[in-house]
Design a protein with these regions (language model features):
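Extreme N-terminal basic, low-complexity initiation segments
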Residues: 2-5
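Catalytic cores of the polymerase beta-like nucleotidyltransferase superfamily
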Residues: 7-257
Length: 257
């Protein structure tokens, strides 16, 4: 599994990859945009807001896999979500509003809608609210380029970081802020190794792996043996699972897990 050398790739892709139209597999697309999600998206658009599926579900959809956890997001803030749902007589649950999430309740199910304009962030050991982000800022704030894409109900893929190109070329590339966030969230180390298992022949920037190795001692701070076991099991279930586990150990993970 050879690394990609240099950081020029990220800088170049930032300038070239913006908005793309996909040839949509209708059945797969219906798994992303269920009738309930369509209904919520229609309401948000009626009031001038955007609505997209974001993150890992988009990655899996492009890879032709069934998306598991579907994250549905909007640029409306939580108070605007509640206002719109009230105006349209949509039952909702606002217990998650502290995290920017409002749940729309339908007869056939529920849709969690999370605002990209409001989020909680851990910085220097303290939790603070971040407001006013747009779609591109939200994409830049994710961990990997392949997890930063979003897609709307019309099948338009929004790619601000070159994630589609990386996905097609089996590259696992950290977004710049992830280098700093690892100190606050060591789980990002496990997620990086897990992402290698999405591909038959993954590649990565050399500098990313150097950062991963340098932060290996932080794995000792991860609380909960059950969660660690879940992450390791997930890595083993991926492609080249044993090889990736050996790679983790050679980088020093076995000393801290």
């Amino acid at each position: 599994m050879p690394p990609v050398t240099g950081d020029w790739l990220y800088k170049y892709r930032m300038l070239t990859e913006k908005v793309k139209n996909l040839n949509i597999d209708e059945k797969k697309f219906e798994q992303l945009f269920t009738p309930e999600v369509h209904s919520v998206a229609d309401v948000l658009r009626k009031y001038g807001f955007d609505a997209r599926v974001v993150g890992g579900a988009v990655r899996d959809f492009i890879r032709g896999q069934d998306p598991r956890d579907i994250d549905f997001a909007t640029d409306a803030d939580p108070s605007e979500l509640i206002y719109m749902f009230n105006m349209e007589d949509i039952p909702h649950d606002d217990k998650g509003i502290g995290h920017g999430t409002v749940k729309a309740v339908f007869g056939g199910g529920k849709v969690d809608v999370t605002s990209i304009a409001y989020k909680l962030e851990l910085k220097d050991g303290k939790i603070r609210a971040v407001t006013g982000q747009d779609w591109e800022q939200d994409a830049q704030d994710r961990d990997l380029t392949i997890n930063s894409m979003s897609i709307d109900k019309d099948g338009v893929l929004y790619d601000y970081t070159g994630g589609l190109d990386d996905l097609r070329n089996q590259r696992v590339v950290m977004l710049p802020h992830t280098h700093d966030k690892i100190t606050e969230d060591p789980h990002l180390i496990m997620r990086w190794f897990k992402a290698l298992g999405y591909f038959d022949n993954p590649r990565w920037p050399k500098q990313d792996f150097e950062i991963i190795k340098r932060h290996m001692p932080l794995l000792a701070k991860i609380k909960g043996l059950e969660k660690t076991d879940r992450e390791l099991s997930s890595i083993m279930r991926g492609k080249n699972g044993q090889k990736i586990i050996r790679m983790m150990c050679s980088a020093g993970a076995d000393k801290y897990l």
